[in-house]
Design a protein with these regions (language model features):
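Alpha-helix-loop-beta-strand connector modules within alpha/beta enzyme cores
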Residues: 93-116, 204-236
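Active-site-proximal loop/turn and secondary-structure-junction residues that shape catalytic pockets
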Residues: 49, 82, 124-126, 188-190, ...
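Active-site glycine- and acidic-residue-rich loops that bind
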Residues: 53-56, 166-167, 175, 209-222, ...
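Aromatic- and acidic-residue-enriched carbohydrate-binding clefts of CAZyme catalytic domains
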Residues: 83, 92, 131-157, 196-215
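Non-globular sequence segments
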Residues: 117, 123-181
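Short beta-strand segments at enzyme active-site cores
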Residues: 76-79, 118-122, 179-193, 234-241
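N-terminal amphipathic/basic-hydrophobic helices that include classical n-h-c signal peptides
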Residues: 1-24
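N-terminal capping/small domains of soluble enzymes
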Residues: 6, 22-123, 165, 173
Length: 246
């Protein structure tokens, strides 16, 4: 049974360390910039998934994001959002076609009305997903290696699949820009597709997308570059990375 230690059991904190930490945090409420966007403070709400029907924004989502913005954070990261309709399911929000833009607009407006920014997080789940929306379409991954979480064995992506994916991300990012988002973030962590390419556990490829760390990072970097060409030099494009394979 876990027992919380009493205060007497905790090592004393040096006053020098305590006040040094406070001095480092004093800028939390200061205005700053992240690329082209202005942050009214240093508080950023991390991405948490939203469960919705058919990938469309719900009224409950709009209410939640507005409440988060009213709470005072400078920037909110959306829940992960799919760029490929074949990965649709499990209530994940979507931006793989223009039909989703109108649903995002009132959510964006509600966040902006509270003087906050909103970034759309984009993802491809790869074999980190249980089943494709179209059963005739295979799950895609870096290599045909069983997924530790789902047990599914994906089809190793061809160069055509890779080019298609990069374009899907670029098109979704442009939709985000046109909808009014302040930027996008590529989800390259937590066992999803970009992460599957970056780790040697899943990536057993012998082509330009496998082997060295530079090669395993190539898909993420090239996707960023493809997005950048589509959205222009000033639109923020962030990347969420993971430092370990777990």
């Amino acid at each position: 049974v876990f027992q919380r230690p009493c205060m007497e059991q905790l090592a004393p904190i040096s006053p020098v360390v305590y006040y040094s930490a406070l001095s480092q945090m004093k800028s939390l409420f200061d205005k700053t910039k992240a690329g082209a966007i202005v942050l009214k403070n240093r508080f950023v709400r991390a991405s948490v998934g939203d469960h919705v029907k058919d990938g469309f924004v719900s009224a409950a989502m709009i209410e939640k994001y507005e409440a988060l913005a009213r709470g005072g954070v400078s920037t909110i990261l959306s829940g992960y959002t799919l760029v490929d309709g074949n990965e649709h399911g499990h209530g994940i929000t979507a931006m793989w076609s223009d039909e989703f833009i109108a649903g995002w607009k009132p959510l964006i407006d509600s966040v902006h009305s509270c003087d906050a920014n909103i970034i759309l997080q984009l993802v491809s789940v790869g074999s980190g997903y249980n089943s494709p929306a179209d059963p005739s379409m295979p799950l895609l991954g870096a290599s045909a290696v069983p997924n530790m979480r789902t047990g599914r064995i994906p089809k190793a992506m061809t160069l055509y699949d890779i080019e298609r994916l990069k374009n899907q991300f670029a098109e979704a990012a442009l939709r985000a820009k046109n909808a009014g988002f302040d930027g996008v973030e590529l989800h390259a962590a937590h066992g999803y597709l970009f992460h599957q390419f970056s780790t040697p556990y899943y990536n057993r490829r012998s082509d330009a997308y496998g082997g060295s760390l530079n090669n395993r990072s190539r898909l993420t970097i090239e996707t960023y570059q493809t997005i950048r060409k589509e959205v222009g030099p000033d639109f923020p494009v962030w990347i969420k990375l993971q430092s370990q394979d777990g």
